[in-house]
Amino acid sequence: MFTVFLLVVLATTVVSFTSDRASDGGNAAMSDLIALTIKGCCSHPPCFLNNPDYCG
């Protein structure tokens, strides 16, 4: 019975770890999308003036 318990804990840990890694990739993709959107904004003078912190 203890062996079954250990297998369940191990399986849960592996699934959780791989889910976290997949989610990190999604977060990185979202950061890239936000960066591209901000860069697009910075090329337009009205948007640039409204967002000086992002456009530097």
From Swiss-Prot:
Localisation: Secreted
Region (Ser-Xaa-Pro motif, crucial for potent interaction with nAChR), start-end ranges: 43-45
Modified residues (Cysteine amide): 55
Domain of life (superkingdom): Eukaryota
GO cellular component terms given for this protein: extracellular region; host cell postsynaptic membrane
Propeptide: 17-39
UniProt feature coiled coil, ranges: none
First and last residue of the signal peptide: 1-16
Expression tissues: Expressed by the venom duct.
Keywords carried by this UniProt record: Acetylcholine receptor inhibiting toxin, Amidation, Disulfide bond, G-protein coupled receptor impairing toxin, Ion channel impairing toxin, Neurotoxin, Postsynaptic neurotoxin, Secreted, Signal, Toxin
GO molecular function terms listed in the Swiss-Prot or TrEMBL record: acetylcholine receptor inhibitor activity; ion channel regulator activity; toxin activity
Similarity comment: family membership: Belongs to the conotoxin A superfamily.
Job of this protein: Alpha-conotoxins act on postsynaptic membranes, they bind to the nicotinic acetylcholine receptors (nAChR) and thus inhibit them. This toxin inhibits human alpha-7/CHRNA7 and alpha-9-alpha-10/CHRNA9/CHRNA10 AChR (complete inhibition at 3 uM of toxin). In addition, this toxin inhibits high voltage-activated (HVA) calcium channel currents in rat DRG neurons (22% inhibition at 1 uM toxin) probably by activating GABA(B) receptors (GABBR1 and/or GABBR2).
Protein name as annotated: Alpha-conotoxin Pn1.2
Species assigned in the record: Conus pennaceus
